[in-house]
Amino acid sequence: MTEYRSASIIIPVDDDYKEFVMAYVSQELKSKLAPKIKAICKKHGVKASLAVRNHSTLVLNVKSGKIDFIGDYGDSPETRADAEKFGIQVNPYHYKNHFNGDAYFFLSEVIPAMNAGNWDKSDIQVDYFNVGWYIDVNIGKWNKPYALEA
């Protein structure tokens, strides 16, 4: 497995300088991960685009498809109504608790594919986050909802 080097920054800490690795995703990395992600989308009948935001986040924007993300999301009618109106920003750490059915199976494949070669050496107790890059999965957008295809 290939591990990708992120950008680093040198910061003065306690009269000394320490190097910190920052989350970084390049267009080159996106193009290496894209074929696998696109294949998963095609397998599940989902139309999506892949983007890089702020050089730190790999973003998958799901626009339309055969998966009923709204129906497979949340337990309450209020949650589903908000999702229909504003879209869904998937939590990549807790999607297993929020989705079921086909949406769960799609996310269970695409999120690990987006994280291929990534690392997470974060220490939450000291509020220090060290990841190769972040990922976001958006189902629809606030101004253009997800389109369920028959």
Each language-model region and where it sits:
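Charged, low-complexity intrinsically disordered tails and linkers
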Residues: 1-15
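Intrinsic-disorder-associated interaction segments
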Residues: 6, 10, 26, 30, ...
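Short beta-strand
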Residues: 49-53
